[in-house]
Amino acid sequence: SEGVMTYAEYAAAEMDTEVVIEAYVQGKQSWWDNKVTAYLQDEDGAYFCYEMACTEEDYAKLTQGTKIRVTGYKGEWAGEVEIMDATFEILEGNYVAPATDVTALLGTDALVEKQNMFVTFKGMTVAPKKDANGNEVAYLYKWDGSGSDGDDLYFDVSLNGNTYTFT
């Protein structure tokens, strides 16, 4: 569509500039305060849309594969490249991205190029973490275990003698 960026144009865009993309919903977080945070992808790349303006009615329509046009600003927070202050419009079209195996990219700088994509890691084993009492657990809510259900989940997995932390 006219005025819509390709993924390459989006990736090359400077931070804090307006971006317009068309992509497909691959996942979403819960609706809250007339906002939604969503993971989008097309055949060329992936996008993280942080707190897009969204009615509860439209939230229900954002099922996996739904095509949307997003207008917002490219930003970054804690290494996460995202589209902020965004609005969206639902379009015709559907695409569900296949999971890309990125196991071989663990521990490399190339992994960040797959940021926000639907990915899979294979052959990994959950490695225990320690809670505040020194007990081995499979995961923690918040980095230090001080959280509860609904907070960020931290867990470790190992492969070939290396341990990786996922959030």
Give the residues covered by each predicted segment.
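OB-fold single-stranded nucleic acid-binding module
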Residues: 1-167
